[in-house]
Structure formats: C-alpha cells, structure tokens
Amino acid sequence: MGQDVFLPIGVFIALLIVWEVAVQLFGIPVYLLPAPSVIWTDTVAIAGTIGNHTLATLGTVVVGFFISFAISLPLAVFMTSSPLISSAIYPLLVLTQSIPKVALAPILVVMLGANELPRLVITFLVAFFPLVIAIAVGLVAVPDELIELGRSFKASKLQELYRIRLPYAVPFIFSGLKVAIALAVVGAVVGEFVNADKGLGYMIITATAFFKTPVAFGSLILLSIMGVVLFQIVVIIERIFFPWSAANQETTIG
C-alpha cells in the first residue's frame, strides 16, 4: 500500500525538479513554459479567485456524473432485457459517442442557451457511454449456472435482477464509474471552453488569451488533481461498501 502511494509521489516530485532545472538551465520564457515555482507563485496569488472557479467546475462534473449514472443504470437494464432491444439501442449509443463533443458544444449552446445546461449535457454525454456499456456487460456476464440456480428456486425476473445480476455486475459498474468520473472532468472543461463565465476551463481560455501561462498551467494542474481525487473517492466507496468487488478488481489487475 505504501509503495503504491509513495512511488507515484516520488516520480511526480522528480519530474517537477527536472522541469524546474530545465526551464532555468535553458532560459525558456515564462509565456512558453513556466517553471513549477512560477506556476505555484502565480496560482497562489489568486487562490480565492481560482478556488471559486474550481468549485464551479467541480459542481458541473459531479452533477453531470450523477445524471449519467442515474440514466445509465436503468438503460443498461432495459438493453440487456432482450437481444432485440440491445441490437436496436447499441448502434445509437455508438453513434452518440462518435460525435466529437467539441463540435457538438456550440450547437448545444444555440439550442439550449448560454447557460449551465449545455455544459451539463456535454459532461453527461462524455461520461454516459463507458458507464452504460460497463453496466450492460456486467449484467450479461453472469454465469449460466447462477441464472439456472435462481430459476430452480423459482426466482422472478425482478428477483433475478436484484439478487443475481446486479450483485455480479458490481465490479463492472465500478470500473465504469471510475472511467466515467475521469471523463466527466474532460466533458466539463470542453463545455467551459465553448460557453462559460466561470470554471477552470474558462480560466485556461482567459489566461492564455492574455499570455498568463502560469495561471493556465495552474488551472490545468488543478483539473488533474480534481480528476485523481474524484477517481480515488470512487475507489474508496467501492472498498468500504463493496470490499469483495475491490478485492476482485485488485486481483484481476495484479
């Protein structure tokens, strides 16, 4: 456990040191590649402002993520209820996923208005596909022996879902949740690039427009930290409430 935590931190610190030394050694201009020390100083100088923008992005990420989960779960159940339904819906899901979200964002602004809604829709769309697919795969991955066992006890379709399929699908669901929460951060920023007056994506666009590259890098680093923290929250929830699922995934990865 300690190695899993301290090794990445050590590598990250080493990269920061190399970055700092390289910038100083080669005299790279601040507007091209600021040193980590400059990024830290300039970001801390506007801590209050950038904190508010961080909370704005976090709100969009969390709301969009929960909406994607709330829709993905029943849709996956519906899809897997019949091969015919799955064949009808799956191509539509692939179609929506293949649409570039950066190209879709300005269209959504025109359709839905210059407000929070387009950003939420983009966040939802980015997080939705991997989640619904992961849940659907988990629901149909149940061994036939378990299904036959349930039917031998005269389990109804609803009981089969709640007592067999959903518990078996938990590791798949959490795999999808981990991917979805990371992608939700990306979706929120894409939405902010196109239409926003707040958020870290807005900060990056504004900072680069005025050549405040350290602030842009600071915002980018905060986005990365946000993604890692949210990912770890999902991991912790899985370990606390579904320890057998977490152990199963760790064994599979290991």
Predicted regions and their residues:
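N-terminal signal-anchor transmembrane alpha helix
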Residues: Q3-L25
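Transmembrane alpha-helices
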Residues: V121-L125, L158-G191, G218, L223
